[in-house]
Amino acid sequence: MNNNLFSKLLLWLLLITLPVTVFSQSTEFTIQDVKFESQGVTLAGSIIKPENPFAAVVFVHGSDPVKREMALAKRLAKEGIAVLTYDKRGVGESGGVYVGPSVGTNNIDSTNLNLLSNDANEAVKTLQTYLKNKKIPIGLIGVSQAGWIIPITANKNPQIEFMVLFSCPTITTLEQLRFQFYTNGNNNFWENHTDADAIEHTKNDPDKYQFEATDPKNYLSTLSIPGLWLFGEKDIQIPVKLCIEQLNKFKVKGKPFEYTLFSALGHNTVFDNDTTPFDISIQWIKQKTLNLKKTKSSK
């Protein structure tokens, strides 16, 4: 079945099976600027909050030096989800130092990824203090580099109850760099290469950098919270088929991990003009948070 057709069918099934009246939400929301401490520096962000949120999320950045993602946060708030989004460490109004470049040793070495996970964890704690209803599920949503940061963060904080990962790797940092150097930014890469070829190079090419690799599987293996990965098949930043291969191994073991593949999309699945990935993520969050609430009420 065509992957895009499958994605739209999945969205339709979610829509007809979900009791949407539970999540009726006006488009009104408030925006409140906040500051919080993390590892000795002050980070600045904004909380975008609808009147009666059914869930809350912290947005976790990709590797670039980016400020808070207000446009995405507003889209989430209009769907009934409270969001804390902040300027990345060393960017905008946030203190500290941005560790760059975005492609290179120090940006994705274990020290920096752990530091960024501490920032995300402190953001979760901060967001919780601004929620009137302390019982609503809180999760993490992120892009690209967040594929390493989110599992680390979720391991640090048992109050994180779900995760949504757009174009995020499930392979090691060194493997991702091998693939990225192999594709070399060529948007036509997949016209002349196969998945088998890409996987072979990702697993066996010599490393241009030498540092301790971070393997998200070490953290995902200890998690029992639901997770959704959304991939673009034309991605030239991460080897999607290899990432899916890793997720399938977790699924066989009973992990509550799901993924959706979009044949026409590349790396920026959440920011693409095609809103299907975003729409599917919203319906998934609604379904999972409803399940979480049922589980809590039955205890």
Name every feature range the model reports, one short phrase each:
Residues 106-130:
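Alpha/beta-hydrolase active-site loop
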Residues 156-200:
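Hydrolase active-site cap/lid region
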Residues 25-51:
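N-terminal cap/lid segment of alpha/beta-hydrolase-fold proteins
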Residues 76-100:
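Conserved alpha/beta-hydrolase
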Residues 72, 225, 239-249:
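Short alpha-helix in the alpha/beta-hydrolase fold that links the catalytic acid
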Residues 54-62:
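Short beta-strand element of the alpha/beta-hydrolase
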Residues 223, 229-231, 235:
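Short beta-strand/loop motif that positions the catalytic acidic residue
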